[in-house]
Structure formats: structure tokens, C-alpha cells
Amino acid sequence: MENRTEADPIITRVALPGDVPAMLACDTYAHIHACRGDTVRTAAGKGQCLLALHAGQVAGYVLLHHEFFEYGFVPLVVVSPAQQRRGVALRLLAAAGAACRTAKLFTSTNQSNLAAQRLFAGAGFVRSGHIEHLDEGDPELVYVIFLR
């Protein structure tokens, strides 16, 4: 699935295993946490990863699975530092919504991550609840968007 308009130079599509090195190259967290690479490789191998391309280069990626109480769930959205604040994350969340097989799509972030909270609100997600004790002193806020 490729998604692009004439006015928007960002292309979104399903990531392939061969895309993983370029995806990890744009992910600053992955540079210092090797386990991120394992997570991304596994997701790409299962077809659970979408990427955004700008001018042929990976601008970001999103993971999507359907194992959160059998609903779609986005556990990770990554945008290259050079592409941040340009709508890439919104495009990735929209692509995840289009690829989601369920009527609800969930995601989450730490209470301390104000940028992610603004992103999710801007993408149409609403607060659904929270989970304590994942990161002590920093509750995980759960969000949902109703797709159908």
C-alpha cells in the first residue's frame, strides 16, 4: 500500500525487511539501544511496520499490531530528527489508521511526553485511560481513535 498526493511529497507504505537498516539509521534511540533493532526487524518481518519516505529517504516509521485486546495498537512512532514538525508523524498515524483491521486503534505514551500527547490529540485520538507502574512516577496514558 502506497499513499501519496501531488501536493504532499511524503509516501507511506508497508516496510520491508530490507528497509530496516535505513529505518534504524533515522532512529536516534536505536543508536544506543540495540533491542530497538530487534523489535523493528520482527515487526517488519511480520508486516507490522509502515514507513514514510520523503525524497526517497526514510523520514520515519510506525509499528502497528492487533494484539492489544484484539484491537489495533501503535506501540511506536519514530520520525527522523531532520523531518520532525513537518507532518510526518501525522501521516504515519493516518497510515496506521488506514491499515488497522479493527474499529478502534489504540496507542500510548508516558505522561511526561507532552509532544506525543499533542501529536495524538492532533491526529484525533482521545484519552482512554492510564496504566500505573510501567515507569514508576510516570504513568502510561492510553489513547484511542474510533475509525469506523
Label each residue range with its predicted role.
Residues 114-127, 132:
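Conserved N-terminal glycine/acidic-rich loop preference
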Residues 106-109, 126-142:
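Conserved catalytic-core motifs of GNAT/GCN5-like acyltransferases
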Residues 70, 103, 126:
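Short acidic/polar active-site loop segments enriched in Thr and Asp
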Residues 79, 85-98, 118-122:
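Conserved acetyl-CoA-binding loop-helix of GNAT-fold acetyltransferases
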Residues 5-6, 10, 14-76, 80, ...:
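Acetyl-CoA-dependent GNAT
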Residues 99-111:
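Conserved GNAT acetyl-CoA-binding A-motif
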Residues 76-84, 109-110:
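A short, internal acetyl-CoA/4′-phosphopantetheine-binding micro-motif in the GNAT/acyltransferase core
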